[in-house]
């Protein structure tokens, strides 16, 4: 399945999720071009997410959302101006081919969301997205894996971990190959990366356990599934919420 063009809603969700995928996910790459902000207003640049802006400005995601009337899944658009809650005038380094003028901000990135704020186990039922061996667990470290990587033979079926609506099918996010994202509620999104064949379309409703793809190695060193569960834009440890492999959830 070829990647389709993104609508605004899907693009916003991709921008949101890309902070985990592009800045701290399995590719480990970071954006080399960041924006600037002055006073208490930040202008959204290409590739920004609410979480990335939070880290840059020191304003929490919750506060940014409150000040700007943004609801989950926290969609933002290029050029949008965001209030920062009275932040002091600051600017951050920006690489450019124009004159070399570099300013450095004295802002402290916000810390990772503590586990105490994660949803309680059993609040929602999740199914394993595939069968296989977990070769890379979730990590809370900066630059660590914000999901789990599961290895199995090429073509192994991949299933929706829960019922929901497909909000992205494509390969525009570098380092994640053929990627599918499913929105399960206003709070939860799951992501399935490195697929071989993708069997769903944008906007399609899926059932829990429905086959959505086959395992592949697109943009990966080996055949694997990179799987994420995101709760209110924050990546949480899937192993904490999935039942033991081979068993049904008890919730």
From Swiss-Prot:
Sorted alphabetically, the Gene Ontology BP terms of this entry are: cellular response to cell envelope stress
Q: How is it placed in the membrane, per its record?
A: Lipid-anchor
Which Pfam families has this protein been placed in?
A: LysM, Peptidase_M23
Localization per Swiss-Prot or TrEMBL: Cell inner membrane
Query: Disulfide connectivity?
Result: none
Query: N-palmitoyl cysteine: lipidated where?
Result: 26
Q: Which residues form the LysM domain?
A: 40-84
Leader peptide range in chain numbering: 1-25
Q: What happens when the gene is disrupted?
A: Cells are shorter in a single mutant, while triple envC-nlpD-ygeR disruptions have defects in septation and cell separation and form long filaments (15-fold longer) and further yet by the quadruple disruption mutant (envC-nlpD-mepM(yebA)-ygeR, over 21-fold longer). Quadruple mutants are less sensitive to ampicillin lysis.
Keywords per UniProt: Cell inner membrane, Cell membrane, Lipoprotein, Membrane, Palmitate, Signal
* Region Disordered, annotated ranges: 93-115
Known InterPro entries for this protein?
Cell_wall_metabolism_enzyme, Dup_hybrid_motif, LysM_dom, LysM_dom_sf, Peptidase_M23, Peptidase_M23B
Q: Which residues fall in a compositionally biased region of kind Low complexity?
A: 93-112
Q: Which GO terms describe its cellular component?
A: cell division site; cell outer membrane; plasma membrane
Gene Ontology MF terms: metalloendopeptidase activity
Lipidation, kind S-diacylglycerol cysteine: residue numbers?
Answer: 26
Keyword check for Cell membrane:
yes
Family the UniProt entry places it in: Belongs to the peptidase M23B family.
Full protein name: Uncharacterized lipoprotein YgeR
Q: Which species?
A: Escherichia coli (strain K12)
């Amino acid at each position: 399945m070829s990647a389709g063009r993104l609508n605004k809603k899907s693009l916003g969700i991709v921008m949101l999720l890309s902070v985990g995928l592009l800045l701290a996910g399995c590719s480990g790459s970071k954006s080399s071009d960041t924006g600037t902000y002055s006073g208490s207003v930040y202008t959204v640049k290409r590739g920004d997410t609410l979480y990335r802006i939070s880290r840059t400005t020191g304003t929490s995601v919750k506060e940014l959302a409150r000040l700007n009337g943004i609801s989950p899944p926290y969609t933002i658009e290029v050029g949008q101006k965001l209030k920062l809650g009275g932040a002091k005038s600051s600017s951050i380094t920006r690489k450019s081919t124009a004159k070399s003028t570099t300013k450095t901000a004295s802002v402290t990135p916000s810390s990772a969301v503590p586990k105490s704020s994660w949803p309680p186990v059993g609040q929602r039922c999740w199914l394993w997205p595939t069968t296989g061996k977990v070769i890379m667990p979730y990590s809370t470290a900066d630059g660590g894996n914000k999901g789990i990587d599961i290895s199995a033979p090429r073509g192994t079926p991949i299933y929706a971990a829960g019922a929901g609506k497909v909000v992205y099918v494509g390969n525009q996010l570098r380092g994640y190959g053929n990627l599918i994202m499913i929105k399960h509620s206003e709070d939860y999104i799951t992501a399935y990366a490195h697929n071989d064949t993708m069997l769903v379309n944008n906007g399609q409703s899926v059932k829990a356990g429905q086959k959505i793809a086959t395992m592949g190695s697109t943009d990966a060193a080996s055949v694997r599934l990179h799987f994420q569960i995101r709760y209110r834009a924050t990546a949480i440890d899937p192993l904490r919420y999935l039942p033991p492999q081979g068993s049904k959830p008890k919730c």
